From Swiss-Prot:
CDD domains: MTAN. GO terms for molecular function: 6-amino-6-deoxyfutalosine hydrolase activity; adenosylhomocysteine nucleosidase activity; methylthioadenosine nucleosidase activity. It comes from Helicobacter pylori (strain J99 / ATCC 700824) (Campylobacter pylori J99). This is Aminodeoxyfutalosine nucleosidase. One of its GO terms (biological process) is nucleoside catabolic process. The active site is at E13 (proton acceptor), D198 (proton donor).
Length: 230
């Protein structure tokens, strides 16, 4: 039986996922988190929210792979838009991710770079292709682009401009790069799907609170369509 890991960062991001699948989930505590295990259309799915930030999402992704043996990881959640063509509730799939808060420039390394690693972390081409196929079938304007991750909630014009100029990023959040990094190191295909909840500007906090639930549901509904075809 195929095993699929499904992650969000916050409870609000996985609640619609659990509701949409509509199966009985067993709750399994591990590493300070709760993993929801169930069977959907002859696929074992493991759902969890990591809590916010790169450390938490690294722990949860590693647990999914090593303790539950998931063979694919799908991340569903919300993000802040960095570009004009990404509006509230739009969907974006990450082609690459970057840790925008990594700075070893004192040692002449480029921003985002860690020795024995790389600036950009790749996601699964096959999973992204599936996402695009589903988007075409459902007439959804799915966008592709670089997503920047860091342990800060971006809410300023200056930081937005930096992320675009330095990394050519389309959106910003706080977990995707670490999830993709863990998956890459363990050889597990990964897809990071985000729905836009704010514009990462001075009004981002208010916008995030207002649109979190709607945007999380948009991402969750699309993710379920992907699982249906895996």
């Amino acid at each position: 039986m195929q095993k699929i890991g499904i992650l969000g960062a916050m409870r609000e991001e996985i609640t619609p996922i659990l509701e949409l699948f509509g199966v009985d989930f067993e709750e399994i505590p591990l590493g300070g988190n709760v993993f929801h295990k169930g069977v959907y259309h002859n696929k074992e799915i493991i759902v969890a929210y990591s809590k916010i930030g790169k450390v938490h999402s690294t722990l949860t992704t590693t647990s999914m792979i090593l303790a539950f043996g998931v063979q694919k990881v799908l991340f569903s959640g919300v993000a802040g838009s960095l570009v004009k063509d990404l509006k509230i509730n739009d969907l974006l799939v990450a082609t690459q991710l970057v840790q925008h808060d990594v700075d070893l420039s004192a040692f002449d390394h480029p921003l985002g770079f860690i020795p024995e690693s790389a600036i950009f972390i790749e996601t699964s081409g096959s999973l992204n292709a599936l996402a695009k196929k589903i988007a075409n079938e459902q007439h959804i304007a799915l966008k592709e682009g670089v997503i920047a991750s860091g342990d800060q909630f971006v809410h300023s014009k200056e930081r937005k401009e930096f992320l675009v100029s330095e990394f050519k990023a389309s959106a910003v959040e706080m977990e995707g790069a670490s999830v993709a990094f863990v998956c890459q190191k363990f050889g597990v295909p990964c897809c990071v799907l985000r729905s836009i909840s704010d514009n990462a500007d001075e009004k981002a906090g208010m916008s995030f609170d207002e649109f979190l639930e709607k945007s999380a549901h948009t991402s969750a509904k699309f993710l379920k369509s992907m699982v249906d075809e895996l």
